[in-house]
From Swiss-Prot:
Tissue: Expressed in the gland cells of the pharynx and weakly in the pharyngeal neuron.
Major localisation: nucleus
Organism: Caenorhabditis elegans
GO terms for MF: DNA binding; DNA-binding transcription factor activity, RNA polymerase II-specific; protein dimerization activity
Entries under Gene3D superfamilies matching the protein: Helix-loop-helix DNA-binding domain
Keyword Transcription: yes
Positions of disulphide bridges: none
Biased composition (Polar residues): 131-140
Protein name: Helix-loop-helix protein 6
PANTHER family, per the entry: BASIC HELIX-LOOP-HELIX TRANSCRIPTION FACTOR, TWIST (PTHR23349), BHLH DOMAIN-CONTAINING PROTEIN (PTHR23349:SF108)
PROSITE patterns: BHLH
Residue span(s) of domain bHLH: 173-225
Length: 268
């Protein structure tokens, strides 16, 4: 079934073309509205003329309704403003060129890339917008390229406090000073326990006793000296050190007479 150009323009008063990546709308102004012969329409026309009066008016109404049904619907979104001049694309002579655009002439890769690049390009700072400062740019670059230290690397070594202070600020040096003060405190406590052991009633050849036993023995020895100041006969009936062997962690030999021996050695 062949369709002539006049019938095609009558059926489709608006055509669309796609050339060089651009959609264009063509409005066919010189359309020849010729009714399409239809057996059903002819039968209805004969029936109306024979049976119903005023057939001329009804026939015109039917023809207009049929023509409205045959015209394709146009969306309201494609409204062409009348204020701007209408630029009509040249109408091709062949119907095939209207229905099937030349695909070989359409750029496949160039056109979408240009559109995407135009969308992705950031806006350049104008005179009204403030330019980013150099300090902010340096901060962002330092955060982006932060140095990562692998703790499991074989070449990893403990840095010196001076190096830590240079890299991470003065906070690392304060931590190092705090650790140094803690070590000094532990050293002083150990020296105090050593001086306290020298005053206890234990021989110097005795093995070193623990800190807990040192404190327990010091408490009992202070009680013994207090009772001895009250009564000189307390040393003959002293029970201050009873049960110390059961509480102590090791077998410690206690001799009250060794106090004079320790004091004489300290005086020497």
């Amino acid at each position: 079934m062949s369709i002539s150009q006049n019938n095609f323009l009558t059926m489709f008063p608006v055509t669309y073309t796609f050339e060089n990546g651009v959609y264009s709308t063509i409005i066919n102004q010189n359309t020849i509205q010729t009714p399409i012969p239809n057996p059903i329409q002819h039968h209805i026309q004969n029936h109306i003329q024979t049976s119903i009066p005023n057939t001329n008016l009804l026939l015109e109404n039917v023809q207009t309704d049929v023509q409205k049904l045959m015209v394709p619907l146009i969306d309201q979104q494609f409204h062409i403003p009348t204020s701007t001049p209408l630029q009509l694309a040249p109408i091709p002579t062949q119907i095939q060129s209207q229905l099937q655009p030349q695909i070989s002439q359409i750029p496949i890769h160039n056109q979408p890339q240009i559109q995407i690049q135009s969308q992705v390009q950031p806006q350049l700072p104008t005179q009204s917008q403030p330019k980013p400062s150099s300090k902010a740019s340096l901060d962002t670059s330092s955060n982006a390229f932060k140095k990562y230290v692998n703790p499991f690397a074989p070449e990893a070594t403990v840095p010196l406090p001076v190096e830590l202070e240079d890299q991470y600020g003065p906070y690392s040096s304060s931590v190092w000073k705090r650790n140094e003060r803690e070590r000094c405190r532990v050293r002083n406590v150990n020296d105090g326990y050593e001086r306290l052991r020298k005053h206890l009633p234990v021989h110097f050849d005795e093995k070193r006793i623990s800190k807990v036993d040192t404190l327990r023995l010091a408490i009992r020895y202070i009680k013994h000296l207090d009772n001895l100041l009250r009564s000189e006969l307390h040393q003959y009936n002293c029970k201050c050190f009873n049960g110390f062997q059961e509480e102590s962690e090791g077998n410690i030999l206690i001799d009250i007479s060794t106090f004079n021996f320790n004091s004489s050695n300290n005086a020497m």
